[in-house]
Amino acid sequence: MEIFFTSTLLVAIAEIGDKTMLLAILLATRFKKPVPVIAGIFTATIANHALAAWAGSTLASIFMSEAFRYAVATGFILMAAWTLVPDKVDDDINVASQRGAFVATTIAFFFVEMGDKTQVATIALGAQYHAVWAVAAGTTLGMMIANVPAVFLGEQLVAKISLRTVHKIAAALFLVLGLWQFWELSNPA
């Protein structure tokens, strides 16, 4: 359960103010159909994050060296710095609205999440924990915790949250994970 909760907390905080959260607001505003938008976010996220967690776990299994574990730890620390850089999403994102809210959201979310902070975090969590389903389920829940309120509250939510503070908290969590990994490497049991 620790892996699930760590993954959930880390991604829920990192997602606040992220470009995919801004995309959720944009799609909710454009379609005005919250249930299909939320279903599309869930479908895209579980597919994307299951692949990301699997990739991280597989890479870690192939490269079981200490150097790879140091690279993962360094990756968490770099994620801390990256989290402090605010995201933007173009208002001109071309969403195939003729396909309907669910399909358009699923496609848009899946591709916008590629290379995003939360996807990279999911890869790193998969590499660290080797628990694909716990990581994917946790990161997906984290995405839903951040994005479902964004779909319903949209701009009101963004206006009331200090994104700078949230980004600092997320950066601190990534930093702690990286330092913890380094500590585990230097103090083997």
What are the residue ranges of the model-derived segments?
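Small-residue-enriched transmembrane helix starts and helix-helix packing motifs
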Residues: M1-I16, K88-V112, V135-A137, L141, ...
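Juxtamembrane transmembrane-helix termini in multi-pass membrane transport proteins
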Residues: M1-S61, A121-L141
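Structural signal for membrane-spanning alpha-helices in multi-pass inner-membrane proteins
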Residues: L10, A52, A80-T83, A108, ...
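Membrane helix-loop-helix hairpins that form the core translocation module of multi-pass transporters
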Residues: K32-S97, A101, P149-A172
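Juxtamembrane boundary at the C-terminal end of a transmembrane helix
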Residues: W180-A189
